[in-house]
Amino acid sequence: MSKNERRTFLLDFEKPLWELEARINQIRELAEENNVDVSEQIAQLERRAEELRQEIFSTLTPSQRLQLARHPRRPSTLDYIQAIADEWFELHGDRGGYDDPALVGGVARLGGRPVTILGEQKGRDTKDNVARNFGMASPGGYRKAMRLMERANQFNQPIITFIDTPGAWAGVEAEKLGQGEAIAYNLREMFRLDVPIICTVIGEGGSGGALGIGVGDRLLMLEHAVYMVATPEACAAILWKDAKKSPQAAMALKITSSDLKELGIIDEIVPEPSGAAHSKPLEAANLLKQTLIDTIDELSSLSPEQRRKLRYQKYRQIGVFFES
């Protein structure tokens, strides 16, 4: 990300860090112009910048993590695919006359192994977001996803899904086309697939839109991603009739990776580089790639029957609690 882009998309809590880094760059440029050695001073400031970065990103509130998950420069599904796949060939269409650009998928090679990868795709700017419907998939998108997963099952390829959506498309047309049925069908059929399934929340995991490609043997979540039954804004509007109370809603909804790991909903948190994925996208992709390869190796050691049984048990246990 360029300096101008970073300034444009700067979040409030990132400003102290950005100002310090800008000062470091300014000192470095002045030193080069005047042929002055300030390496010791710069090293000291860089250590302070790293300390500040750790301090900021280790104490984020749920609403701040939501801002990171929605960051315009956060890596998308296609960004991760292009970074981690040795080969990639996109497949199109639901075989029912529709090809939803909000949900992409295809065949790839990951760590030398053939896999099928699919996920929701947001846009980079307003025009692209409109074309991608802001990552909100239609019924045709979920049917395309199921077609690709059935194909992966036929050819014994592990399935990787990337979840990044505020929710499934909720328009009248989507309801006419069977949005609820399409998501429910995917939920049922993903429990029946023989191959390993790894689902990863890479950004925003919203409601049924996330669930439609979210049934797997392992549910991973990037450190600063969020996973939620409803957006905090919607929750605040419903409960308190005031969207300004979304920070309180974000806290109550338990949307962060650490909360969801503690609750047993996700299986593993994938760490992000210092400063979050949008600041170092390639490093974030490498961390995710290794986790995916290791998880596929682990799941491949199980039989299809074992995977299906454990997958079913995993989701049956979600929400179980004991009262003293």
Curated annotation (Swiss-Prot):
- The chain's disulfide connectivity reads none
Q: Cellular component terms, GO, for this chain's entry? A: acetyl-CoA carboxylase complex
Keywords from the named record: ATP-binding, Cytoplasm, Fatty acid biosynthesis, Fatty acid metabolism, Lipid biosynthesis, Lipid metabolism, Nucleotide-binding, Transferase
> What is the enzyme's main class?
transferase
Pathway of this protein? Lipid metabolism; malonyl-CoA biosynthesis; malonyl-CoA from acetyl-CoA: step 1/1
Protein location: Cytoplasm
Predominant localisation class: cytoplasm
Domain CoA carboxyltransferase C-terminal: where?
Answer: 44-298
Superkingdom classification of source: Bacteria
Give a short account of what the protein does.
Component of the acetyl coenzyme A carboxylase (ACC) complex. First, biotin carboxylase catalyzes the carboxylation of biotin on its carrier protein (BCCP) and then the CO(2) group is transferred by the carboxyltransferase to acetyl-CoA to form malonyl-CoA.
> Which family, according to UniProt?
Belongs to the AccA family.
Assembly and interaction partners: Acetyl-CoA carboxylase is a heterohexamer composed of biotin carboxyl carrier protein (AccB), biotin carboxylase (AccC) and two subunits each of ACCase subunit alpha (AccA) and ACCase subunit beta (AccD).
Q: Which NCBIfam families match?
A: accA, AccA_sub, PRK05724.1
Report the protein name in the record.
Answer: Acetyl-coenzyme A carboxylase carboxyl transferase subunit alpha
